[in-house]
């Protein structure tokens, strides 16, 4: 792998061959690499896993957050070995190869993490050639010429193109994923800016009937489904770029006092819709053990996070009340509107991977819908 500043990081390639350019970042979760690699929020990113053993349980069809892998590749400390898990269907390296994703093993991932922590997320090219033949100057130039995530709208590239209904509930060891019929439940329309499947599962488990629409759906297209509430999903890229088509729709929904719940990118878009601003973080928050303080009662939730942009707390208008703060750096982790039935969080209450401290937010959304639209 080569960084835009010319630094080279050598390792043992696995997965697909070729080269891919994107932003390299680090993720501190000890488990859940399947969920992480398939999370659409990681589009155009290369993941440096801080935990040394990645791939040891292989890959399967159940522990994924999308139909394909969205991260461009990954960097790991130890070589990928044969999986040891009764649910495994593929070796991790074979899984990456089948989805045209590149891996790099044998890297001092702690040193790379230290570099990224100091210098911030970096543009990089990850390359794999079994013969070890690389045009280093060309790779460096590719990394330097890549525009970067700032100003980039990636939501429409990972979003669904057609609306669909979702009935799958959360997974259990005995029964796998359940199918839940919530025809009498409140109808939630989820706008897909890069939806994770486990968000949809938690909405269903909370009692919602769920319909998913594309990121670029207009206000009329959303309302054609007669929603009782609208969910704004997570997703990749710069929220300010996605806002060009998303914010006008959200503002129209706010005007009719539609109950709204946003997660991650959805949180940022809700903030932009009420006049706040967002910024690119130095290194971002990516892990499954991030403590968040709930301001209403000072309780702490351990959360899963994955974002490289954030909402500027001091830009919030009077009607947007901060509800959660990151205990790592004090950045905004949640907000609630005082004049509209809308709230959002920067972190991932659906986890996958991560703790389940914040599952209650899905129930809160359904309760809000019941209150506003009895």
UniProtKB/Swiss-Prot annotation:
Signal peptide: none annotated. Its EC number is 6.3.5.5. The keyword ATP-binding applies. The gene is carA. L-glutamine binds at residues 41, 235, 237, 265, 268, 306, 308-309. Keywords: Amino-acid biosynthesis, Arginine biosynthesis, ATP-binding, Glutamine amidotransferase, Ligase, Nucleotide-binding, Pyrimidine biosynthesis. GO terms for biological process: 'de novo' pyrimidine nucleobase biosynthetic process; 'de novo' UMP biosynthetic process; glutamine metabolic process; L-arginine biosynthetic process. It catalyses: hydrogencarbonate + L-glutamine + 2 ATP + H2O = carbamoyl phosphate + L-glutamate + 2 ADP + phosphate + 2 H(+). It is an enzyme of class 6 (ligase). Composed of two chains; the small (or glutamine) chain promotes the hydrolysis of glutamine to ammonia, which is used by the large (or ammonia) chain to synthesize carbamoyl phosphate. Tetramer of heterodimers (alpha,beta)4. Pathway: Amino-acid biosynthesis; L-arginine biosynthesis; carbamoyl phosphate from bicarbonate: step 1/1; Pyrimidine metabolism; UMP biosynthesis via de novo pathway; (S)-dihydroorotate from bicarbonate: step 1/3. Small subunit of the glutamine-dependent carbamoyl phosphate synthetase (CPSase). CPSase catalyzes the formation of carbamoyl phosphate from the ammonia moiety of glutamine, carbonate, and phosphate donated by ATP, constituting the first step of 2 biosynthetic pathways, one leading to arginine and/or urea and the other to pyrimidine nucleotides. The small subunit (glutamine amidotransferase) binds and cleaves glutamine to supply the large subunit with the substrate ammonia. The active site is at residues 264, 348, 350. This is Carbamoyl phosphate synthase small chain. Disulfide bonds: none annotated. Belongs to the CarA family. Residues 187-374 form the Glutamine amidotransferase type-1 domain.
